[in-house]
Amino acid sequence: MRKDLFAFLIIIIGVFTSCNHSQTRLEARGGDTVRFEYARHLKIVKYQGYSIATLTDPWKQGKILHTYALVPKGKVGDEVCKAFSSGNNQEVTIVRTPITRSVVFTTVHCALLYDLKAESAIKGVCDLQYISIPDVQQRAKLPISDAHHVVDCGNSMSSNVEKIIDLKPEAIMVSPFENSGGYGKLDKLHIPLIEMADYMEESSLGRAEWMKFYGMLFGREKAADSLFN
């Protein structure tokens, strides 16, 4: 894992060398690692202008499940995205933050977004009939024209791709499974798939600590830290 991470950082340094020398110097000095006391499958390093979140594969020791670049919206973030794109680095999924439009596949993570006061970012859900959050059920009954309306995107194992496309989400929150073979049509939408592997943590505190990652995604980092602590 350390070798993979080191190689990844070398790639990123190369990307910024070709686009912005001052940014490269910042990168070369390294970033600030977010402290995780209990989570074992998540590492986040903050750099100037973006953060890198690395999810280790809970089923394959030493392998990486997914790597995300969390890039703030705005002009500075636009330049960071250009640097990533010019490097043709297909191993990194860029997520513009804060996410304000998302499709959430699990009731657990819907509840977490409510705890983080980020429920307005829930625009679509899967398995609506199993979501025990009264407000989500009420929002699903609202007229489609209502800004608070939540769309039922069908079964999480075979979601309605057309409905998801219509929502224009900035991210889709999915649960990874061992040997799943990917996410079918969702993989082809060019919409960031956030693989919520928190349930594979061995301890309840480890699972809960992932809220720091979700807080960063939805612009609720301080709320997540406060909630966890």
Regions found by a protein language model. Name each.
Residues C19-N229:
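N-terminal ligand-binding lobe of clamshell/alpha-beta domains
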